[in-house]
Swiss-Prot record:
One of its GO terms (cellular component) is cytoplasm. This is Leucine--tRNA ligase. It is found in: Cytoplasm. Its EC number is 6.1.1.4. It comes from the Bacteria. Pfam families: Anticodon_1, tRNA-synt_1, tRNA-synt_1_2, tRNA-synt_1g. It catalyses: tRNA(Leu) + L-leucine + ATP = L-leucyl-tRNA(Leu) + AMP + diphosphate. The lineage of its organism: Bacteria, Pseudomonadati, Pseudomonadota, Alphaproteobacteria, Rickettsiales. Disulfide bonds: none annotated. GO terms for biological process: leucyl-tRNA aminoacylation. A motif ('HIGH' region) lies at residues 36-46. One of its GO terms (molecular function) is ATP binding.
C-alpha cells in the first residue's frame, strides 16, 4: 500500500495537481484548516482535522469550483524557545527542522494542499508586513503602551492575555497565574466591541456555540456609572458601574477590586488586608468566579448614599469584583444579587428588599425584574421604568450617567520572550517612544543568543537592543518584548491569497478569494484566534488591505481524538504500544506486570496516550487512517481511536482491490437480467453522498458507500451477473470514495483503463428518474391495527389498492363478512380499513 501511496504523491507533485490560479472563470471556494504549530510531528488529531478539510476541498473541486486549499506554519512560540533552552540551540534551527519533518508527513497523507502558497510566520519576509501594520495601528492610536496589571505566568516567564488564562492557570503551562504591574503594548480591540458584537448575527454558517461564546466574551452590559462620596472626605468619590441602578435603595455595601486605586490612597493595609490582596492577586476574570466562595475584607472606609446622606455603606475589598470590568467597584444589593447575598450573609451585612417578590430574600436573592418597593421616589415603578428614572436623577444631580460596558478588554500583545516577532519600537530618553522607520523593517531576531532559561534573552543581548534613535540619533534601546503569537495567526489566511505579494496583502487576490468559505478547527479558539482574526479583518478593511468585513464565512469545529490512558504499578503513564491485552486485563509488554487502564481522554504528550502516525502508516497506509478518522464518528463529535476500527478500514480498502480483480475478470453476459435495485442504489448513493458531504456528515457518506460496495459484492457472487450495472456501480463507487481515500482510488481508476486522473473529474451525476422504485410495500390495518402487508406496483390506482386489500385473507378474517364503512389511504404507506 505504501508503494501505491508514494507513487500517487509523486504524480500529484509532478503534475502540480493542487496548485490553483487566481485567474479562473470558475467560481471560487476557499477551504482552510487552522495552521499547525511545528512541534515536530503530526498527530492523529491533526490528521482528522486535515482529512475533513481535504474531503471538502477535493469534493468542491469535483463540483467545478476553483478551490484554494493552502497550508503553512504558525512557527513562533514558547515550545521552540523551551527546546532551545533544553538543547542549547537556536529555536530557529529547531523550528525549521520540525517544519521539514511535518511537511513530509503531511505530503505522505496525500492531502491536496497548494504548497506553492506555503507561509511560515517566523520568516522575516512574512512578519515584516505585520511590523509595518503595527506601526500603522500606532499612527491611528489603535496601538499603545501603558502600565497595567497583567497576567504573569511564572513557569513560561511571560504575560498572558485574559483569553489565555483558563481557570486561573496559564493555558500552556498550567501554572497558577499571578498579577504583575508592567508596561505592556495593547491593541484597541475595544474600539470595535460593538461592531464585533453586532456582526455575530451575520455569521449564519458558524456553530451557535461559538457565536454564543464570542457574544458572552464581548459581554455588553447596559447600566449606569455614578459616584459615592467617601464619608469624612467628601472631595473623594468611588465611581461604580451597575447594570441594575434601580436597586440603589437596597445597597448595603460598596465592593471594590483588590487593586482598586482607592486602596493605595486611603486604606490602612492591615495584615488581614494584605493577606487578602495577595490571595486575590491570583484571580483573573477567566476564573470560574461564580463557583468560588465569595469573600471580602472591610477597608475601614465608608461612603454616603447618593440619595440619603444619613445612610452610610462600608467599603469592602471583595474577591468577585475585578478591576478590568466596569470601574472596579460595585454597590452591593444582597436582596437582588446572588454574589452580594452570599457575601452579606458571611459578613452579617443588611439585606433590604426593594423589588416585590413572593419569597424570603433573607434566605435567597430574588434576581428577577418586578415592581419597586422601599425605594423612595422609585416606589411603584417597574424595574425598567425605575432604571430610567434613577439615571435621570443621577444626571440631574451631576453624579452619574447612562453607560455601556464591555467585558472585552484591549488585547495585550506584549510577550517577554525571544522567539516571537520583534515589536518595531525604540525607547529614547530624549524623544520617548519612537517607531522604527518603515525603511528599516523588518526588525529581525539575532542569531547569537544565549538561552539560560532566565527571562527574555533580548533584554541582556550585548548589541541587538542598542541602537541610535531615528529622531535625534542619540543612543537608545529597542523594545525587547515580542508579539503575542496570535498576532501572526490573525491575518495569515489573507497572505495565502498571494504569498509572494510585495505588500501585506494582494488586494485583488483577496477580493477574489475572501472570505474563507469554510474554516475548520477546534472550538478552543472561539474567543482568542477567531475573535482576533475578526478584529484584524475589520481594521485591515479600513486600511484598504481587504474588502471583506468578516474573515470566515463558514466555520466547522471538529471533535477531538481520544484514547485510553494506561499506568504501571508505579503510577507512571505508559504509551499504548507498551501495553498488551490478555483477556480482559492489560499487561506491560516487557515486564508482564499488570497495567491499569484509565479514562479515555484527549490524546496528549503528558499522558502518553498518543498514537504514532508513522507506525500506523507503515502498518495500514494513509488511506486507511484517513478513512478511520472520518468514518467512526460524526466529524463534530469526539472520536475514540481503536485498533479494531483502523483494521476494519484497512480490510475495506483491501476489499476494493479484490472487487476490482473480480470485476475485471467478468465477461459480458447479454442474457443476464438487469439488476434494477442495484442500479437504483448507485444513483441513490451518488445523490445522498453529495448531500452528506455538503452537510459535513462524512461518516454517513462513508456508511452509504460501504452499503453500495456490499451490494456490488453480492451481485458479483451470483450465478447470473448484471455485469454492465456492476461495472458502472464500481466505477461510481471509486469516484465517490476518491475524496476520502485518494491513493487507492486513483490506482484502481488507472487499472480500470481510464486515462484521466480522478482529481480532474467531475463528481458523478445521478438520474432522478432512476431513484423511483417499481414497487412499494403498504401496511394494511383494520380499525387501526396492523393485520397484513402487501407489495404494490407503482402504477396501481387507489381503487385497485382498496379492492386488493379488502380481499386479503388476513383482512377478511377481521371483517367477519361486514362491509367496510371507510377506507383511509396514506399514499405508499398505510391502508386503514374501518368497520
Amino acid at each position: 500500500m505504501n508503494q501505491i501511496e508514494q507513487k500517487w504523491q509523486y504524480i500529484w507533485q509532478e503534475e502540480k495537481a493542487f496548485e490553483v490560479s487566481n485567474a479562473s472563470s470558475k467560481p471560487k471556494y476557499y477551504v482552510l484548516e487552522m495552521l499547525p504549530y511545528p512541534s515536530g510531528k503530526i498527530h492523529v488529531g491533526h490528521v482528522r482535522n486535515y482529512s475533513i478539510g481535504d474531503v471538502i476541498a477535493r469534493f468542491m473541486t469535483m463540483q467545478g469550483f476553483n478551490v484554494l486549499h493552502p497550508m503553512g506554519w504558525d512557527a513562533f512560540g514558547l515550545p521552540a524557545e523551551n527546546a532551545a533552552i533544553n538543547n542549547n540551540s537556536h529555536p530557529k534551527k529547531w523550528t525549521y527542522s520540525n517544519i521539514k519533518n511535518m511537511k513530509k508527513q503531511l505530503k505522505s497523507m496525500g492531502f491536496s494542499y497548494d504548497w506553492s502558497r506555503e507561509i511560515n510566520s517566523c520568516d522575516p519576509e512574512y512578519y515584516k508586513h505585520e511590523q509595518k501594520f503595527f506601526l500603522e495601528l500606532y499612527e491611528r492610536n489603535l496601538a499603545y503602551q501603558k502600565e497595567s496589571f497583567v497576567n504573569w505566568d511564572p513557569v513560561d516567564n511571560t504575560v498572558l492575555a485574559n483569553e489565555q488564562v483558563v481557570d486561573g492557570r496559564g493555558w500552556r503551562s498550567g501554572a497558577i497565574v499571578a498579577k504583575r504591574y508592567l508596561k505592556q503594548w495593547f491593541l484597541k480591540i475595544t474600539d470595535y466591541a460593538e461592531e464585533l458584537l453586532n456582526e455575530i448575527q451575520n455569521l449564519k454558517e458558524w456553530p451557535e456555540a461559538v457565536r454564543s461564546m464570542q457574544e458572552k466574551w464581548i459581554g455588553k452590559s447596559i447600566g449606569a456609572n455614578f459616584h459615592f462620596k467617601i464619608k469624612d472626605n467628601e472631595e473623594t468619590t468611588i465611581e461604580v458601574f451597575s447594570t441594575k441602578p434601580e436597586t440603589i435603595f437596597g445597597a448595603s455595601f460598596i465592593g471594590i477590586a483588590f487593586n482598586h486605586p482607592i486602596i493605595e490612597r486611603l486604606v490602612s493595609k492591615t495584615p488581614e488586608i494584605l493577606a487578602f490582596i495577595t490571595q486575590c492577586s491570583h484571580i483573573t476574570r477567566s476564573s470560574k468566579l461564580e463557583k468560588a466562595e465569595k469573600e471580602g475584607v472591610f477597608t475601614g472606609l465608608f461612603v454616603t448614599h447618593p440619595f440619603d446622606s444619613n445612610i452610610v455603606l462600608p467599603v469592602i475589598i471583595t474577591n468577585f469584583v475585578l478591576m478590568d470590568y466596569g470601574t472596579g467597584a460595585i454597590f452591593g444589593c444582597p436582596a437582588h444579587d446572588e454574589c452580594d447575598h452570599e457575601l452579606a450573609v458571611k459578613m452579617n451585612l443588611s439585606i433590604k428588599q426593594v423589588i416585590k417578590a413572593d419569597m424570603d430574600v433573607q434566605k435567597t436573592a430574588y434576581t428577577e425584574d418586578g415592581i419597586l418597593i422601599n425605594s423612595d421616589f422609585l416606589n411603584g415603578l417597574t424595574s425598567n421604568e425605575a432604571k430610567q428614572e434613577v439615571i435621570r436623577e443621577f444626571e440631574k444631580l451631576g453624579i452619574g450617567k447612562r453607560s455601556v460596558n464591555y467585558r472585552l478588554k484591549d488585547w495585550g500583545i506584549s510577550r517577554q520572550r525571544f522567539w516571537g516577532c520583534p515589536i518595531p519600537m525604540i525607547h529614547c530618553e530624549i524623544c520617548g517612544i519612537v517607531p522604527v522607520p518603515y525603511k528599516d523593517l523588518p526588525v529581525t531576531l539575532p542569531d547569537d543568543v544565549n538561552f539560560d532559561g532566565h527571562g527574555n534573552p533580548l533584554d541582556h543581548h550585548p548589541s541587538w537592543k542598542h541602537v541610535n534613535c531615528p529622531k535625534c540619533d542619540k543612543p537608545a534601546v529597542r523594545e525587547t518584548d515580542t508579539f503575542d503569537t496570535f498576532f501572526e495567526s490573525s491575518w495569515y489566511f489573507m497572505r495565502y491569497c498571494n504569498s509572494n505579494a510585495t505588500e501585506m496583502t494582494d488586494k485583488k487576490a483577496c477580493d477574489y478569494w475572501l472570505p474563507v468559505d469554510k474554516y475548520i478547527g477546534g472550538i478552543e479558539h472561539a474567543v482568542m484566534h477567531l475573535l482576533y482574526a475578526r478584529f484584524f479583518t475589520k481594521v485591515m478593511n479600513e486600511q484598504n488591505y481587504v474588502s471583506v468585513q468578516e474573515p470566515f464565512k463558514g466555520l466547522f469545529t471538529q471533535g477531538m481524538v481520544l484514547h485510553a490512558t494506561y499506568k504501571d504499578e508505579h503510577n507512571n503513564w505508559l504509551y499504548p504500544e507498551e501495553v498488551v491485552k490478555k483477556g480482559n486485563e492489560f499487561f506491560h509488554k516487557e515486564s508482564n506486570n499488570r497495567v491499569v487502564q484509565g479514562r479515555i481522554e484527549k490524546m496528549s504528550k503528558s499522558k502518553k496516550n498518543l498514537i504514532d502516525l508513522e507506525t500506523m502508516q507503515e502498518q495500514y497506509g494513509a488511506d486507511a487512517i484517513r478513512l478511520f478518522v472520518l468514518s467512526d464518528s460524526p466529524p463534530e463529535k469526539d472520536l475514540e481511536w481503536s485498533a479494531s476500527g483502523i483494521e476494519g478500514c484497512s480490510r475495506f480498502i483491501n476489499k476494493l482491490e479484490y472487487m476490482f480483480k473480480a470485476i475485471d475478470s467478468l465477461k459480458d453476459d447479454v442474457n443476464s437480467e438487469v439488476n434494477k435495485e442495484l442500479n437504483r442504489l448507485v444513483h441513490f448513493t451518488i445523490k445522498h453522498v453529495a448531500e452528506d458531504i455538503k452537510h459535513f456528515a462524512l461518516n454517513r457518506a462513508i456508511a452509504r458507500m460501504r452499503e453500495l460496495s456490499n451490494s456490488i459484492s453480492a451481485e458479483i457472487s451470483k450465478d447470473k451477473i448484471d455485469v454492465k450495472t456492476v461495472r458502472h456501480g464500481f466505477n461510481v463507487l471509486v469516484q465517490l470514495l476518491n475524496p476520502f481515500i485518494p491513493h487507492i482510488t486513483e490506482e484502481i481508476w488507472q487499472k480500470l483503463g481510464n486515462k484521466e486522473r480522478l482529481y480532474n473529474l467531475s463528481f458523478p451525476a445521478f438520474d432522478e428518474s432512476m431513484l423511483e422504485l417499481d414497487t412499494y410495500i403498504m401496511a394494511v390495518q383494520v380499525n387501526g391495527k396492523l393485520r397484513d402487508t402487501y407489495e404494490f406496483k407503482t402504477s396501481v390506482s387507489e381503487d385497485e389498492i382498496k379492492q386488493v386489500t379488502v380481499s386479503l385473507p388476513k383482512v377478511q378474517k377481521f371483517l367477519e363478512g361486514k362491509e367496510p364503512k371507510k377506507i383511509i389511504l396514506v399514499p405508499r404507506k398505510i391502508v386503514n380499513i374501518l368497520v
